[in-house]
Swiss-Prot record:
GO biological process: one example: rRNA processing
GO cellular component: cytoplasm; ribosome
Record bears the keyword rRNA processing: yes
Name of the protein described by the UniProt record: Ribosome maturation factor RimM
Organism annotation: Chromohalobacter salexigens (strain ATCC BAA-138 / DSM 3043 / CIP 106854 / NCIMB 13768 / 1H11)
Chain ranges of the PRC barrel domain: 106-184
């Protein structure tokens, strides 16, 4: 499963996925610190054509250079050559057209594809919707939030274990079937 996701931001739309965020200027030549939602974090640099989104304004830009810096990342973008310009884009989301994402093998999914799916048990009971996912050492975990159709108001954490817990993912129907006891 690929970890490129939309994070918790609203800049994501039907055509774009949020890969990360520009956090603050770095130095005086227009470099910016980058917080990446990709796994590994350097994966954000595999995409040279970015769309920056901040407060409803969008700007297409090209990645000139990117590199690790300490525990994070820094990037230089074409057209942003001073600290003042970098400050204007600090806090911007880094978007990528979904069509630019690499194709995945059957049974693999990007996290953003799973977010919002209705989650049902093998017996057809609705547990809620996938709100978001997070990574643990052993496996990824789905956070299932209650919805209007869910059988109760409980939030659940389900391990993303294909064939064991996750029995079927139907993106077209917007549904995931899980082998999970609703009482757990």
């Amino acid at each position: 499963m690929s970890h490129e996701t939309g994070g918790a931001d609203t800049a994501q739309d039907d055509e774009h996925v949020v890969l990360g965020r520009l956090t603050s200027p770095y130095g005086v030549k227009g470099w910016l610190k980058v917080y990446s939602y990709t796994s590994p974090i350097e994966g954000i640099f595999e995409h040279a054509e970015w769309v920056l989104s901040k407060r409803g304004e969008r700007r297409a830009c090209k990645l000139s250079q990117g590199r690790p810096h300490g525990k994070g990342l820094v990037a230089s973008l074409e057209g942003i050559s001073s600290r003042e310009l970098a400050e204007q884009w600090a806090g911007a989301d880094i978007l990528l057209p979904k069509q630019a994402l690499p194709a995945l093998a059957p049974g693999d999914y990007y996290w953003y594809q799973l977010e919002g799916l209705r989650v049902e048990t093998l017996d057809g009971e609705c547990l809620g919707q996938v709100n978001y996912l997070f990574e643990t050492g052993a496996n990824d975990v789905l956070v299932i939030r209650p919805s209007e159709a869910s059988l109760d108001e409980r939030e659940r954490l389900l391990p993303f274990l294909p064939d064991d817990v996750i029995r079927q993912v139907d993106l077209d129907a917007g549904r995931m079937i899980v082998d999970w006891d609703p009482e757990f």
